[in-house]
A protein has these predicted regions:
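Start-transfer (signal-anchor) and selected internal transmembrane alpha helices
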Residues: 1-41, 234-238
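Hydrophobic alpha-helical membrane-interfacial segments at the cytosolic entry of transmembrane helices
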Residues: 26-32, 231-258, 272, 337-342, ...
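Membrane-embedded helix bundles of polyisoprenyl
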Residues: 31-34, 123-224, 238-257
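Active-site lumenal/periplasmic loops and adjacent helix-entry segments of GT-C-fold
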Residues: 42-135, 140-170, 280-307
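Periplasmic/ER-lumenal interhelical loops and adjacent helix-loop junctions
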Residues: 56-77, 242-324, 359, 363, ...
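Transmembrane alpha-helices and membrane-interface helical segments
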Residues: 126-130, 134, 173-180, 215-223, ...
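Membrane-helix boundary/interfacial segments in multi-pass membrane proteins
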Residues: 158-165, 299-309, 338, 342-381, ...
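Membrane-interface helix-loop-helix junctions at transmembrane boundaries of multi-pass membrane enzymes
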Residues: 226-237, 310, 320-353, 399-402
Length: 402
């Protein structure tokens, strides 16, 4: 869904010159520099990520894969070092079939895994830049969107899970390419299927499911705006074709996973209520460490929820997103705002009541552990709404001189 500025809504010449400076190349270079500045030890090899699940889950899994790869077993099916032994490739989250895992398999650990995570952060920022620019047609606003998507509490908290970085890194690209596939068909469907398959191989089923909910919602808005029955039918067929292709391309990973799931201890109510956002957690959107406790390692976690260290998005980002929702009123911004509100309510788990109601209607939702993960859609829509807010600021007329 693209947007073009009409002459009446276009920024002033000085603002146009500023906007023209923020090209994709400059944004990409700037984002890369920002990540290097934020994590110099990881980039230059003098340090490594280690906190929480990165050290006790993520790195050991990758180390086993790395060791197996160099021992002549590039696709290990079994991990003898996990408890008394456990399936490896079938666990999905081990990223065994993710093609770009070759980066950390061929290069030395732990440096390669840390840089691998940062590369996917960069990838996600670039994807959000392209997606936002397609909507608001302003490079400066798209730049803000890309930065907000990368540098927020939720995204940075997810660094401890390398497979989460893959899912988040490809998220904007899935939305962008599937949107184009529904509009253009043909080769665009194949491109969307490949991109979505890359995210599918990350092994984060909750994020993948929510990605497709967002994609379908945005496509529904596009169909409503066009008011063209033939386009609706065509877009629906193209979307279905994309989903079928993704399913086929991912079958080598999905079939073993579902067999493992059927034999595992995971059930509809497995840890369903653990780590939901408490009522006071709303304050964390405005104050980074609201109701947080300091651990012995010097990090902070929220009372009642210790999966995500912080989901603070930044007051500036939230202000722009609010302006985008109320000032740039379109069907899409209304839908994005609705997704944001729904995301927060579901993240509260039973505290928000709606989660329990939906789980009663769809018991399979109980397989999703930790309701706090439902904040992912909020992290996706906030940069887009902020881009709409920035567009409103850039296009508004200056006040009359006294």
């Amino acid at each position: 869904m693209s947007a073009e500025n009409t002459p009446a809504d276009s920024p002033k010449p000085s603002r146009q010159a500023l906007d023209a400076w923020f090209t994709p190349l400059r944004f990409g270079i700037g984002l890369a520099i920002a990540l290097v500045v934020a994590f110099p030890d990881v980039v230059f090899g003098s340090g490594a990520f280690f906190h929480q699940d990165y050290g006790v889950l993520g790195y050991p899994v990758i180390h086993h894969h790395h060791h197996s790869f160099w021992s002549g077993d590039p696709i290990p099916l079994w991990n003898p070092y996990s408890n008394c032994g456990a399936p490896f490739m079938a666990q999905w989250g081990t990223m065994t079939l993710y093609p770009f895992s070759l980066f950390y398999l061929l290069l030395p650990l732990p440096w390669s895994l840390g840089v691998f995570c940062l590369i996917h952060l960069w990838l996600g920022g670039m994807g959000m830049y392209r997606l936002a620019h397609r909507r608001v047609d302003l490079r400066f606003a798209a730049t803000l969107a890309g930065l907000i998507f990368v540098f927020n509490g939720f995204t940075l908290s997810c660094i401890q899970w390398p497979n989460y970085m893959i899912a988040l890194g490809w998220l904007p690209w899935v939305a962008l390419t599937v949107e184009r596939a529904c509009e253009r068909g043909g080769r665009a469907i194949a491109i969307a299927a490949v991109v979505a398959t890359l995210q599918m191989l990350s092994g984060v089923p909750e994020f993948i499911f929510m990605t497709w909910v967002i994609v379908v919602a945005l496509q529904a808005v596009a169909i409503i705006e066009k008011r063209d029955r033939s386009f609706a039918l065509l877009a629906g067929r193209r979307l279905a074709a994309t989903v079928l292709l993704v399913t086929g391309l991912s079958a080598a990973q999905l079939l073993p996973f579902f067999e493992l799931l059927s034999l595992s201890q995971r059930h509809n109510g497995f840890a369903a209520e653990k780590w939901a956002m408490p009522w006071h957690g709303v304050g964390n959107f405005f104050v980074p460490l609201f109701h947080c406790a300091k651990t012995y390692t010097g990090t902070f976690f929220q009372w009642g929820q210790s999966l995500i260290a912080t989901y603070y998005l930044g007051l500036g980002a939230m202000t722009l997103a609010t302006i985008g929702a109320f000032r740039g009123r379109t069907k899409e911004t209304t839908a994005l705002a609705g997704i944001a509100i729904l995301s927060v309510i579901l993240a509260m788990g039973e505290n928000g009541y709606l989660y329990g109601l939906i789980k009663d209607l769809f018991p399979r939702l109980g397989f999703v552990r930790y309701p706090i993960k439902f904040l992912m859609p909020l992290v996706f829509v906030t940069p887009l709404l902020a881009a709409h807010g920035a567009r409103w600021f850039m296009n508004r007329k200056p006040p009359l001189a006294a």
